[in-house]
UniProtKB/Swiss-Prot annotation:
GO cellular component, one term: centrosome
Keyword annotations of the record: Coiled coil, Cytoplasm, Cytoskeleton, Phosphoprotein
InterPro entries: CEP95, DUF5745
Biased composition, class Basic residues, residue ranges: 427-441
Predominant localisation class: cytoplasm
Protein name in UniProt: Centrosomal protein of 95 kDa
Residues recorded as bearing Phosphoserine in the entry: 445, 447, 449
Gene that encodes it: Cep95
Basic and acidic residues compositional bias, start-end: 325-340, 390-410
Protein species of origin: Rattus norvegicus (Rat)
Highest taxon of the lineage: Eukaryota
Sequence segments annotated as region (Disordered): 310-354, 390-474, 514-550
Length: 821
């Protein structure tokens, strides 16, 4: 799918355009609740359950989107969509919007293909009903059925008015992954349309040079019917315009009836047909390139095998002519069938329910007939391939043994004259299988006579009116698989036998070489013996010498002589002998190489034939598996319809039961109420009188209890008062004792305070005396400082300090004796 936001916007706009919704978005966040509700109602044709028509808030929009998601998950897809929520959609979460757009895109794609298939199947069943009443020959009916059945998986058309029923979801995929894989339309339409133009040009060129019809005849009903009636070639008649081929329109055609238009109805404008339908058929499913020297019969379905036969023998040429005629008849009937399919959706009204059931059974019968015919054709092609291989083996092994020639001749006879692949080996008959084994064509037989053709046509007519179940298809698939396995085992055994013979011849040659060398060796001389003893490798103690026979030797085709010289280094061989032996070895190598090349050529041819048989077996297995899956899907569809009907009947029965139970309950309730209203009996009066007496007794009892409680309360009150008085006396005594103790404490405290005051006064007096003494000393010092003697003493001390400094600085200078500094 698309990765960028612009591509997702394009996908959303394409969805809105296809569903005729007049909305366009410019960014991914524009996909709100209204867009998804409109897509739901347009694609599915139903209203959203539990829808709030006029949303007044963001919660209402989230509720509407969640209703759309829940309806898709529960009613249609039947898978969990818990990763997508309505709240995220309303908030503009890009991941949730992309997931929901992808689901709607895949759902629209799947519905388109489903409705196209149902319309084609309905037209095929209509044609079958008309043909069974004798309106057309039987051979034309068979080819027309085959062509319509083969084109169903590839053709698409617009919706028909009765195509979308209430039970469409019973044939849908089982998971979101399958629904998503059905989509990818917006991204792949451009790729399909680009590759389609080239294929149309190719077919137009091929129609002018060969007799093969282009696929426009299969898509063009008018031209096909004209060719069937008058028989001109493709070059004589010109194709009508493309718009006549209504079945070729795919998703480009607007969806009309399945999508209700809630606004006022506007008739859709005629739109140019989308080139996807026809060109996609031409490019993907009808194109076959012819090889030089070969003739290929074109087929419609890619699962069919192209019939190829070389123009080298007379009987092969006759077979090619028969194949060409049959392919032309088949193509003409296919063209007529496409006309009937294109007209069917507009001619016939919707069928009632019983008619639809009958048509489903007729479709199953027609499909079983077509499957048996295709299996017989593939059986004939396998016989042709195996017969050619047996003939090639018989011509390629001229120099082989006689038993091989007899085996190849016997195999060729079996491949030419047997009726099926199952006659190559012993087998047990299977029930219900032998009547379908003969093929309508033979490749290696002589030209068929008119009697054989008449018998063959009678058998085909009988087979057309006989119903076959799915068990027959299982038996046929198993039988063909066993035949292929038996043939492959036979080829592998033959290949292994040939390889074993080559190995035995090589071993015998090596043995002869060894014997010749053993006989031709001379005795060793004394010198050689001494040399060999000296050059012999010393063995470890306790060990043994290894013999040359202990390990197997590997000898290549070029290394025999060199290996012998390495094994016998002490042996003397002359140069001429060595040269001669080398030449013999080279000649032997050349001879072995030529034989190996011849063997490789035959082996390669056999391998190519085996690969071709395997390829055809794979194609056949894929075809049978496809038919089995298709029948299984049809059976599952019928089972789902049956289960849905059973479920609906059970729901209806449960509703009836609930209604009956409700009605019975209402009747019982009314009767019981009437009965209770009428009950005025003696028992009721006795009960009432007893109740009144009980009330009087209860009242008297309550009075007695009240008096007794009053007496008790007065007695308790007296006791309580006495207790209070005693407690009051006790606490008075305690308080008096406490007052005495407090008074004694006060007196002691006062005495202590008086003693403390006296001590404090004494300390104050001592401090005052001390301070007065110190002040007097200070005053005396101050008076001394005012004297001159004090200052002189200070100056003498200062001068003395200076003299000490001067004696320290000038102590080195010489002074005359008798002088002091």
């Amino acid at each position: 799918m698309a990765s960028s936001e612009a591509e997702w916007v394009t996908i959303a706009n394409n969805l809105l355009f296809k569903c005729h919704i007049h909305l366009r978005i410019h960014k991914l966040q524009d996909c709100d609740a209204n867009v998804f509700i409109a897509l739901y109602q347009s694609i599915l044709g139903e209203k959203v359950p539990d829808l709030i028509v006029i949303p007044r808030s963001q919660e209402d929009n989230a509720h509407n989107v969640q209703a759309v998601i829940d309806s898709l998950a529960l009613d249609y897809l039947q898978v969990s969509l818990s990763h997508i929520t309505g709240e995220n959609i309303v908030k503009g979460d890009k991941g949730s919007i992309k997931n929901l757009l992808e689901i709607f895109d895949g759902l629209l794609e799947y519905l388109t293909e489903h409705i196209s298939e149902s319309s084609h199947n309905r037209s095929a069943s209509e044609q079958f009903c008309r043909d069974s009443r004798g309106e057309e020959p039987v051979e034309e009916l068979e080819s027309a059925k085959e062509s319509s059945w083969r084109k169903v998986p590839f053709m698409r058309c617009s919706f028909s008015p009765d195509a979308l029923g209430p039970t469409w979801d019973e044939e849908e995929a089982e998971s979101t992954g399958e629904i998503i894989r059905l989509g990818d339309t917006a991204h792949t339409f451009s790729l399909r349309s680009n590759g389609a133009q080239n294929s149309m040009n190719f077919w137009s060129r091929k129609a002018s040079t060969s007799g093969i019809r282009p696929p426009e005849e299969m898509l063009n009903p008018g031209l096909s019917s004209f060719l069937f009636k008058n028989g001109p070639t493709c070059e004589e008649e010109e194709a009508p315009p493309i718009h006549m081929a209504t079945s070729a329109r795919k998703l480009g055609e607007p969806i009309r009836a399945a999508i209700p238009l809630h606004p006022p109805y506007h008739p859709p404008e005629p739109r140019a047909p989308c080139p996807i339908g026809k060109e996609y058929l031409c490019s993907g499913h009808y194109l076959s390139t012819p090889a030089s020297g070969e003739h290929r019969a074109p087929s419609v379905e890619p699962g069919d095998v192209f019939l190829t036969s070389t123009l080298c023998k007379d009987d092969d040429q006759e077979t090619d002519l028969d194949l060409t005629e049959s392919s032309k008849t088949r193509r003409l009937s296919k063209g007529e069938r496409s006309e009937n399919r294109a007209v069917a959706p507009s001619e016939y009204p919707p069928f009632p329910q019983k008619a639809r059931k009958r048509l489903t059974e007729q479709e199953l019968h027609a499909m079983s007939e077509k499957l048996s015919q295709r299996l017989s054709e593939l059986d004939w092609m396998l016989k042709t391939a195996l017969g050619d291989r047996a003939t090639g083996e018989a011509h390629g092994k001229d120099g082989g043994a006689g038993d091989e020639e007899a085996h190849s001749a016997n195999e060729e006879m079996l491949s030419q004259h047997s009726d099926s692949v199952m006659e190559y080996g012993p087998r047990k008959p299977r029930p219900g299988f032998s009547m379908h084994r003969k093929a309508p064509y033979r490749s290696h037989s002589l030209s068929p006579s008119s009697v054989n053709k008449h018998r063959q046509s009678e058998k085909e007519r009988k087979k057309q009116h006989k119903s076959k179940g799915t068990d027959t298809h299982h038996f046929q698939a198993k039988a063909l698989t066993e035949a292929f396995e038996r043939e492959l085992r036979k080829n592998k055994v033959q290949e292994n036998v040939g390889l074993r013979g080559i190995r035995e011849e090589e071993e015998e040659t090596e043995k002869s070489y060894k014997e010749a060398f053993a006989k031709g060796t001379t005795k060793q001389s004394q010198v050689q013996k001494i040399y060999s003893r000296k050059t012999a490798a010393p063995t470890p103690k306790g060990g043994l010498l290894k013999s040359s026979k202990a390990s197997p030797m590997k000898v290549n085709e070029h290394s025999l002589l060199s290996l012998m010289l390495e094994q016998f280094p002490f042996l003397y061989v002359s140069d001429p002998t060595l040269t001669k032996m080398w030449k013999q070895q080279m000649a032997q190598v050349e001879q072995l190489r030529r034989e190996a090349q011849r063997e490789n050529r035959s082996k390669k041819k056999l391998q190519d034939e085996i690969e071709e048989a395997l390829r055809r077996h794979d194609l056949l297995t894929a075809l049978v598996k496809k038919e089995y899956d298709h029948n299984k899907r049809l059976q599952d569809f019928k089972d789902r319809i049956h289960k849905q009907r059973l479920t609906q009947s059970k729901i209806k029965e449960n509703r009836h039961q609930s209604v009956r139970a409700r009605k019975y309950y209402d009747d019982y309730r009314v009767q019981l109420r009437a009965k209770m209203m009428k009950m005025r009996t003696r028992e009721e009066m006795i009960f009432k009188k007893l109740f009144e007496e009980g009330l009087q007794i209860q009242k008297q009892r309550l009075r007695d209890l009240r008096n007794y409680a009053k007496e008790k309360r007065s007695e308790e009150k007296r006791q309580h008062q006495n207790e209070l008085d005693s407690m009051e006396n006790y606490y008075k005594d305690q308080f008096s004792l406490l007052a005495e103790a407090i008074s004694q404490g006060r007196q002691e405290l006062k005495a202590r305070q008086r003693s403390q005051a006296q001590t404090l006064h004494k300390v104050k007096r001592e401090l005052r005396a001390k301070m007065e003494k110190e002040i007097e000393q200070l005053q005396h010092l101050i008076t001394q400082s005012d004297d001159d003697a004090f200052f002189r003493e200070l100056e003498a001390e200062r001068f003395k300090a200076r003299l000490q400094l001067a004696s320290f600085q000038y102590s080195k200078n010489p002074f005359p004796r008798g002088q002091t500094p």
